[in-house]
UniProtKB/Swiss-Prot annotation:
Keywords carried by this UniProt record: Cytoplasm, Glycosidase, Hydrolase, Lipid metabolism
Organism: Pongo abelii (Sumatran orangutan)
GO MF terms held by the record: beta-galactosidase activity; beta-glucosidase activity; galactosylceramidase activity; glucosylceramidase activity; glycosylceramidase activity
GO CC field: cytosol; membrane
Protein name: Cytosolic beta-glucosidase
Cited PROSITE patterns: GLYCOSYL_HYDROL_F1_2
Subcellular compartments: Cytoplasm, Cytosol
Chain's gene name: GBA3
Database matches in Pfam families: Glyco_hydro_1
Amino acid sequence: MAFPVGFGWAAATAAYQVEGGWDADGKGPCVWDTFTHQGGERVFKNQTGDVACGSYTLWEEDLKCIKQLGLTHYRFSLSWSRLLPDGTTGFINQKGIDYYNKIIDDLLKNGVTPIVTLYHFDLPQALEDQGGWLSEAIIESFDKYAQFCFSTFGDRVKKWITINEANVLSVMSYDLGMFPPGIPHFGTGGYQAAHNLIKAHARSWHSYNSLFRKEQKGMVSLSLFAVWLEPADPNSVSDQEAAKRAITFHLDLFAKPIFIDGDYPEIVKSQIASMSQKQGYPSSRLPEFTEEEKKMIKGTADFFAVQYYTTRLIKYQENKKGELGILQDAEIEFFPDPSWKNVDWIYVVPWGVRKLLKYIKDTYNNPVIYITENGFPQSDPAPLDDTQRWEYFRQTFQELFKAIQLDKVNLQVYCAWSLLDNFEWNQGYSSRFGLFHVDFEDPARPRVPYTSAKEYAKVIRNNGLEAHL
């Protein structure tokens, strides 16, 4: 089961989740610093990323893990407030530049291609104080930050992700309020944030295109989270339509403007407009793009970056009471099949990734696809022999192989989440996704490979699984 020659095998991390050094060497506070320091049990046991894996001082240890796996690519994110403490280029923190220069240079010296995310949920607190992603002013702030990163690191970094999981960020931070700033705006905030995230991404892509691409010759995209959504009853027309609506609200709301035509899907526009009208709003709760904005947004990604973990079943759920919320706008409910095995929210459904990749190929004109995250957690305490977890990866690789060989999907890179056990947002350190175990009780934060790491290293060496289909 050999993968195509030159296939990229990677692992991923994100700044707030691994670095620690939350106020070291001039770093400014980010929204997760503020959110976790406020307590209130919004994060498991009020844990914080103040130290996390200590990667800010232990990069050499991370590099050893990367080399041990034999990764061809490594995906990590830049901390916006480590580079620009107040989020603007008014003050630039040289120590932050030095840290990321060392990571990039060490990777390249070791034949590893960096995939760099500009922004992975950790907005500078100074910008959140000015309205964050609910304010249109953020578009220019993000563009200036992106240009700063392109000009500082782009001579060596050729693969960029502007915004990590924009579709998760908009809902979790500004609709449900489960991520910072922690204030829910049901049925309104998520759409407002999405609108600004899409425009900020597009602006920064154009900046790269016009100012840096000719010289640097890199690629820029954003990453989107996608659960595969299957009709609960495949024979029910209403469930089939609900599943289509679900994927449209979940993925296409972001992907269609960027990859196809600069505008939201029709079903999203009509559902939200109709619900808004019933609820007495003077206009739709979904903002509209101007014709000029549509032109600016269309075609602003050089590859399709998607993050897949699991699958859900979908059925039609009429919004009789006119409740506010994204699920209510889509008129769906989702749930797992009771026969699926799971840890936390991740149910083992390997065939979902193949269906998702085929959907992206068919809907988005057969783009180059990177899976920028995929993984399976263990609950804490986690055994080092994680043979069961490796089974999730093994079955996933079988499905990726089928997608490439049988469906002719143009998948070029796979990133396992994560290189290290780390701070998993609201779950704190209770959910361990690492290929390497990290002892969070030990100040030295030793990294020890799980069985999965050893097995993944074999896959990378062989460029695929040894077994047949």
